[in-house]
Amino acid sequence: MLKRDMNIADYDPELWASIVEETQRQEEHIELIASENYTSPRVMQAQGSQLTNKYAEGYPGKRYYGGCEFVDKTETLAIERAKALFGAVYANVQPHSGSQANAAVYMALLKPGDTVLGMNLAHGGHLTHGSPVNFSGKLYNIVPYGIDASGKIDYVELERLALEHKPKMVLGGFSAYSGVVDWAKMREIADKVGAYLFVDMAHVAGLVAAGVYPNPVPHAHVVTSTTHKTLAGPRGGLILSAVNDEELHKKLNSAVFPGTQGGPLMHVIAGKAVAFKEAMEPEFKAYQQQVVKNSKAMVEVFLARGYKIVSGGTENHLFLVDFTDRELTGKEADAALGLANITVNKNSVPNDPRSPFVTSGIRIGSPSITRRGFKEAEAKELAGWICDVLDNRTDEAVIAATRAKVLDICKRLPVYA
């Protein structure tokens, strides 16, 4: 018999210490990694439930194991909420991650060697959009597209590449692009060559759910997402479609199970269901609106302080600071800011002369600080502190003073009250 009062702290103090340390780090550091966010205690409660014990290969009503009548309810709730949230007629909530959701779409719609137009990783794309080190770049013929001199997606070049290479799929979406994508234009280009339009909206799903960023679901044949990032749910993946085609839905379902996964994680699916419900609340829309406001406010300060921003600004939750005109690398900036309890990630910029391990930029995202309660005033103040550290990255006094300011604001605006 298992006793409910078992705890990690008494049984495994070494592991518990690492959990406590990470909890403290999250509370005492300002998180600016664009792909990270703080999920709600309700989501964590679902993930810590007894649903973790249940194996449920298959789909609701069509399982390979018995005893699934109640987890069927859980998964159905998640499916119906996802469809309602994004305006889809089909949803698969089983992918364990965004990358696995993407892998399933490739498997469902393509054959190895088929041609895909995907955004260049160096221009803001994602590993699974055709990077040569990823399965997508190894199994498929990837033709990369990118941004123009203004930092915007070059749709003229995208159309030219589509007409020249006749891809089976055009892939939209990004991991480091601060603009607004014209999904209708991408569908128009895909239709000209008879290609599928597949959109990975992982980074902007929360913004899309709140109506503050264009929804790709009405335009694409298939859309994938993570359920964390701006959506602020558990770590996991999602596949959506507004195309009323049962054959397409069957292909996608089969590509997830049994194609790329076995049993779904029912405790995580429960967490997804909670997150989808939370995303339907009015306060979630206000949160996402503030995410964009904070991102724009930070950009204003960086520009005023003489820093270069890729594309000159932002229309979403993230932006890239470009150091190619400075004697500063992304790796150095990342390290210096870390000493001041400010967490960012080094990031390549378009036409970056430095390696991906060094880079000439950093990526900054506002979802986590906004979740803590930052408004424009705090976002601008924070951007100023970042500039102070970058301008004086070898000055221990400046770093120490900034760290003290960070600790103070983190105490005033905790992650979990």
From Swiss-Prot:
Its main location: cytoplasm. Pathway: One-carbon metabolism; tetrahydrofolate interconversion; Amino-acid biosynthesis; glycine biosynthesis; glycine from L-serine: step 1/1. It is found in: Cytoplasm. GO terms for biological process: glycine biosynthetic process from serine; tetrahydrofolate interconversion. Transmembrane segments: none annotated. Its cofactor is pyridoxal 5'-phosphate. The modification N6-(pyridoxal phosphate)lysine is found at residue 229. (6S)-5,6,7,8-tetrahydrofolate binds at residues 121, 125-127, 355-357. The keyword Amino-acid biosynthesis applies. It comes from the Bacteria. It catalyses: (6R)-5,10-methylene-5,6,7,8-tetrahydrofolate + glycine + H2O = (6S)-5,6,7,8-tetrahydrofolate + L-serine. Belongs to the SHMT family. This is Serine hydroxymethyltransferase. It comes from Tolumonas auensis (strain DSM 9187 / NBRC 110442 / TA 4).
